[in-house]
Amino acid sequence: MAGLWRSYQALMAKHPWKVQIITAGSLVGVGDVISQQLIERRGLANHNARRTAKMMSIGFFFVGPVVGGWYKVLDKLVTGGTKSAALKKMLVDQVGFAPCFLGAFLGITGTLNGLTVEENVAKLQRDYTDALISNYYLWPPVQIANFYFIPLHHRLAVVQIVAVVWNSYLSWKANKM
């Protein structure tokens, strides 16, 4: 396991952006597999591989670039590594970024699932508030620790590891019709 971590760190040092995006996409896919197998109890025979591929695409092309880029912007908006700075970063993240990101994520997923604009709006009206409240139960303490203890280039990976559980929930919520 230590060798795997060293390899990951070496790749992060050499190709940080690519590794962050690949990590995000892969872990969004893992979250969907967990959602289908453990939450929805589909079984392997009924696993929707196309849905997992769609969720991975959202991870590769939306989650990874947007969240990875956001952490760079946030580090410039709120500087320093103090507890106070970590708290400020968490507040800006959870008040400014999380609501927008979550709405976009649910909307993109609905679009990729073939929902019309009207169906997508109705789904957002039905699911957004519940998903945002769930977000606030999980992410504030995770983000304070992330912003205080974790270097910028590892933040997306740390968040995505925690997010395997969150991605499972989001995949279930986003794909529930």
Swiss-Prot record:
Spans through the membrane: 19-39, 55-75, 95-115, 132-152
Record site: Determines ion selectivity: D93
Keyword ATP-binding on entry: no
Primary site of residence: mitochondrion
Topology in membrane: Multi-pass membrane protein
Subcellular location: Mitochondrion inner membrane
Organs and tissues of expression: Widely expressed.
Any one biological process term the GO annotation gives: regulation of mitochondrial DNA metabolic process
Example of a GO MF term: channel activity
InterPro entries per UniProt: Mpv17_PMP22
Function: Involved in mitochondrial homeostasis, and control of oxidative phosphorylation and mitochondrial DNA (mtDNA) maintenance. Non-selective channel that modulates the membrane potential under normal conditions and oxidative stress.
Family per record: Belongs to the peroxisomal membrane protein PXMP2/4 family.
Protein name listed in UniProt: Mitochondrial inner membrane protein Mpv17
Organism: Danio rerio
Lineage of source species: Eukaryota, Metazoa, Chordata, Craniata, Vertebrata
